[in-house]
Every structure is written in C-alpha cells, then in structure tokens.
Amino acid sequence: MKYCLPSLVLILTLSASVVLRADTDAEVNARKDALELAGAFGNDGFKIRDGHSCGALKAHDHALIAVNLYAGNQYWFSVGTTEPLKKVAVSLYDETGNQMTTENFSEGDKAAAGFAPENSGQYFVSVDSVGDQEGSFCLVYSYK
C-alpha cells in the first residue's frame, strides 16, 4: 500500500504528459490521396507499410522524415497533398546528406519517389513545397 500511491501519481503524471495529436481533416484527405497512389504500386507487388507521416508545409518549405531502409528491398515513397498546396517534390537523402538517385513520379497533387538502397541504414525523405502554396501533406511508403 505504501508504494501504491507514489506509483499511481507517477502513472497519472506520465499519462498527462503524453499528448496525442489527431490528424486534421486536410491530413486525412492527403493520406487518402497518398494511399491511392501507393495502391497503384501494389500492382507491381509492393506492400504498403503500416503508418504514415502527415504535416503542413509553408511555401518553398520542406519536411524531412527519417526512415530505416534495407538493402535488397525496393521502396516507393508516395505523397498526397491538399489545397491550396498543389505541387510537391519527393527526394531521398542518405545519413550523410547526399541526395540519392530516385525514380520520380508527379501528377497533380500527388508525387512519389522510387528507390532501391545498396546499403541498409537510415535515410531521409524530403517532401518539398514547389511554388508559392502552402497546405497539408501525407507520406506513406511501400516496399517489396
């Protein structure tokens, strides 16, 4: 009983410090578009990875998302956006900041980059706002 009260206080303190951020409606719509694009790669045997990364981009800004990739696999990083953000670019960097050569796709408010790493490790996906618009984006990725 002596340890019960401090344990309860600790649990309440920790649970109060955890802040969960729900996706906005714009991010949900962007994720829908990203999943639609990623689904097209499913025709080539790619599986959509659980999880997603959403956020907001200002004009001429970028977001970096860290991912762990494995040599021997192939990946597609698919991004959907919402108005007024109409055009994004997707690029990939290794852990030292070198830009990787990717196969690129862009159509309207969707973009994707395909990549097959030679080395396993941490990479960074850059989602770049191209133009003067800002808005929400969502990234999902597929692998095989």
Role assignments for model-derived ranges:
Residues M1-S7:
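Positively charged n-region of N-terminal signal peptides that target proteins for export
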Residues K2, V18-A22:
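N-terminal targeting/docking segments
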Residues S7-A16:
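Bacterial N-terminal signal peptides
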Residues L8, L35, A40, I48, ...:
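Generic detection of intrinsically disordered/low-complexity segments and helix-coil linkers/edges
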Residues A22-F46:
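Predominantly extracellular/luminal regions of secreted and cell-surface proteins
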Residues D23-D25, N29, H52-S136, S142-K144:
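Acidic, Ser/Thr/Pro-rich low-complexity intrinsically disordered segments
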Residues F41-L57:
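Glycine-rich phosphate-binding "P-loop"
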